[in-house]
């Protein structure tokens, strides 16, 4: 599929930028050669990973949300209603001005996000307290005219996989509880991807336009920068007032609703591939790997018996729900190992004449490279147990690496040094001026106040020296 040299090798992951670009092409995740800046094409293999990843989040949301689909085009008169919201997006909007050669009476925006597409319909759908809570989500493409350097899966002009949920509630507190639930859902989602994330409440100048507050989750990339991989916004009754979303309460009074919205994009796949991958290619958790097991016949004699054994193992694993393939191509074993290691297949099974003589197979883990002989009679149980071990091992390794790169800092100089390697945990008095001054002095940004950390100490803001019990994450970001 990809136009590449035979057995092309990746740059070392120590040079993360080159490794990342090479990985996308050689492992056949995305082709960057589409002739529109910031728009990229999924290879079928990459799209299979995407499908498996988004199946997880669909499954989590479907427990108490309903999936829907709203139009891509938003009339200008609806889009321009919420002034603060629009101010945050006006420089990024693509506009449709003509239908064919005929100018449109009303300009149409390509959705940068869907609040202004969805909420006019919510006004029609929400009538009574019995209609609440309303929890819908969709997975769609969105368009933003990014003027910064674009990068596949990370910073795009066409986001191809934007999961956005929009909920309506009777009270502010109920909406706040939904924001907390959204963050719990994201933490569980990323746990399934074996990715530890850091939730934090964004500072006021970095909240979603039109929201009361924003909580986001960030992951740490190999180069020490953080990637925002999920957001949840408490919208208060701001959008309800703009779009006239009211319900009749138990006393018969018309009351403005309170709302939330929360989203995840294909950045989740960027952090999945980047966190676990190595110099040989991808390392995928079993749940999202398109191929979970590859069987390599080692044929130098007794080919029929070896292939029969491989097919028997394949059938047994498939009956257990495992995604498995046999590579019986005429390539040498080393070339096969290279191919499937690049694709991140969690387990490789090798079966040759010697293995058959011992009624065994060789099992190799992609994440650690460990190999061991296991009985053919228990191959299914061995594979399924390894899946659990691999998942746990990947999460523990990623969590350990994250924790090692979070640094307690008390001075501006400390922060300057540590953000080159990871995330600084820094005292902050809460004043916007100090926060912005800190950003400027250290060449990094405040992510937010950790929401999963209880502070029991007293600190001094490194900018103004005021005492505070609050600390914030500071990091370089994408």
Swiss-Prot record:
The keyword Ribosomal protein does not apply. Keywords: Aminoacyl-tRNA synthetase, ATP-binding, Cytoplasm, Ligase, Nucleotide-binding, Protein biosynthesis. The keyword Nucleotide-binding applies. It is found in: Cytoplasm. GO terms for molecular function: ATP binding; proline-tRNA ligase activity. Its EC number is 6.1.1.15. It catalyses: tRNA(Pro) + L-proline + ATP = L-prolyl-tRNA(Pro) + AMP + diphosphate. It holds the Pfam family tRNA-synt_2b. GO terms for biological process: prolyl-tRNA aminoacylation. GO terms for cellular component: aminoacyl-tRNA synthetase multienzyme complex; cytoplasm. Catalyzes the attachment of proline to tRNA(Pro) in a two-step reaction: proline is first activated by ATP to form Pro-AMP and then transferred to the acceptor end of tRNA(Pro). Belongs to the class-II aminoacyl-tRNA synthetase family. ProS type 3 subfamily. Consists of three domains: the N-terminal catalytic domain, the anticodon-binding domain and the C-terminal extension. Homodimer. This is Proline--tRNA ligase. The gene is proS.
């Amino acid at each position: 599929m990809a136009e590449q040299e035979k057995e092309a090798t990746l740059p070392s992951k120590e040079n993360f930028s080159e490794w990342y670009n090479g990985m996308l092409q050689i492992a056949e995740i995305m082709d960057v050669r589409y002739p529109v800046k910031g728009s990229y094409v999924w290879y079928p293999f990459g799209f299979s990973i995407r499908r498996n990843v988004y199946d997880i989040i669909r499954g989590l949301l479907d427990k108490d949300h309903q999936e829907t689909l709203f139009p891509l085009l938003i009339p200008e008169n609806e889009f321009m209603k919420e002034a603060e919201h629009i101010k945050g997006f006006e420089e990024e909007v693509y506009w449709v001005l003509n239908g064919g050669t005929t100018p449109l009476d009303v300009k149409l925006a390509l959705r940068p996000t869907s609040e202004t597409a969805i909420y006019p319909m919510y006004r029609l759908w929400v009538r009574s307290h019995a209609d609440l809570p309303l929890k819908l989500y969709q997975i769609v493409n969105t368009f933003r005219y990014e003027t910064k350097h674009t990068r596949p899966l990370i910073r795009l002009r066409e986001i191809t996989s934007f999961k956005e949920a929009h909920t309506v509630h009777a009270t502010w507190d109920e909406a706040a509880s939904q924001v907390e639930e959204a963050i719990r859902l994201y933490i569980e989602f990323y746990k399934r991807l074996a990715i530890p994330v850091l939730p934090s409440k964004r500072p006021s100048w970095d909240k979603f336009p039109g929201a009361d507050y924003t909580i986001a989750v960030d992951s740490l990339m190999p180069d020490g920068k953080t990637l925002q991989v999920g957001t949840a916004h408490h919208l208060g009754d701001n959008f309800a007032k703009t779009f006239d979303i009211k319900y009749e309460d138990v006393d018969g009074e018309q009351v403005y609703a309170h709302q939330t919205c929360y989203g995840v994009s294909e950045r989740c796949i960027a952090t999945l591939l980047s966190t676990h991958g190595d110099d040989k290619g991808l390392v995928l958790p079993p749940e999202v790997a398109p191929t979970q097991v590859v069987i390599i016949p080692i044929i130098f004699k007794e080919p029929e018996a070896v292939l029969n054994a491989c097919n028997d193992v394949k059938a047994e694993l498939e009956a257990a729900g495992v995604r498995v393939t046999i590579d019986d191509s005429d390539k040498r074993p080393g070339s096969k190992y290279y191919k499937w290691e690049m694709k991140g297949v969690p387990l490789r099974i090798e079966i040759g004449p010697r293995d058959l003589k011992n009624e065994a197979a060789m099992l190799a883990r992609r994440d650690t490279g460990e190999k061991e002989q296991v009985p053919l009679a228990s191959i299914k149980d061995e594979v399924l147990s390894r899946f659990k071990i691999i998942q746990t091992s990947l999460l523990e390794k990623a969590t350990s690496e994250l924790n090692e790169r979070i640094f307690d800092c008390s001075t501006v100089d400390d922060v300057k040094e540590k953000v080159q390697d990871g995330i600084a945990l820094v005292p902050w008095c809460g004043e916007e001026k100090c926060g912005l001054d800190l950003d400027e002095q250290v060449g990094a940004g405040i992510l937010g106040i950790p929401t999963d950390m209880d502070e029991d100490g007293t600190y001094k803001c490194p900018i103004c020296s005021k005492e505070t019990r609050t600390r914030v994450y500071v990091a370089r970001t994408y």
